[in-house]
Amino acid sequence: MVRPQLDDPLSCQRLLDQLKDLHEAGLRHLEVAWSSHAGWRRFVQEIQECCPRFALGAASVVAIEALDDLQSLDLAYAMAPCWDPALVGAARDLGQLLIPGVLSPTEVQQTTAFGCRLVKLFPAATVGVAYWKRLEAPLGPLPFVIAAGGLTTIDLSAWLGAGHDAIALGRRAIGDHGVDPVLLGWLNRS
């Protein structure tokens, strides 16, 4: 997940260059934190042009107005940091995949009852690597889960090994220092 500094063209260009490196290394899914900023759509379009193999999504979607941007840019999916049934329902009505964020057993149960087969455990680092499996005994079969929030490249093997279906990395994997070399190595091996 990337969160571009849309008021800083140099920062955006550096980020695009880093995304090209990740694209070439084989990264397949990328989320760009949604913003109502006028430059957000243009930034996403630039990624679509220079990295056509990315399945692009929007992260941090908490407003229904974001759904218009998702639709006009033909984004593959969106992720929310929280469980908002009205937002998930509105996305469904538009034929869009919005992955809700969950943390508590109640949220996991509610999203499952709502028909969500894919959820984002957020913030995952707060609850630890064993948390998700502990929910299985009281709740039964759990949905496909993407662990996100506070995780780094060092966490990849442990979290995937503990049964999380996917990991979303954020600012620590890419930033002013460049792309984390551990991530590039991991992508090149997979």
List PLM regions with ranges.
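Glycine-rich phosphate-binding active-site loops on the catalytic face of alpha/beta enzymes
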Residues: 77-87, 120-129, 162-186
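Catalytic cores of alpha/beta
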Residues: 63-73, 106-115, 131, 137, ...
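Glycine-enriched alpha-helix->loop->beta-strand junction motifs that scaffold or abut catalytic
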Residues: 23-28, 50-53, 72-78, 92-99, ...
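Glycine-rich beta-to-alpha transition loops that act as phosphate-gripper elements at the mouths
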Residues: 1-7, 58-64, 80-83, 100-105, ...
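Histidine/lysine/aspartate-rich catalytic loop segments that bind and position anionic ligands
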Residues: 81-127
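Conserved N-terminal beta1-alpha1 strand-loop-helix module at the mouth
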Residues: 1-76, 93-94, 153-154, 173-190
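Short secondary-structure capping/turn micro-motifs that flank functional sites
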Residues: 37-39, 65, 86-87, 106-108, ...
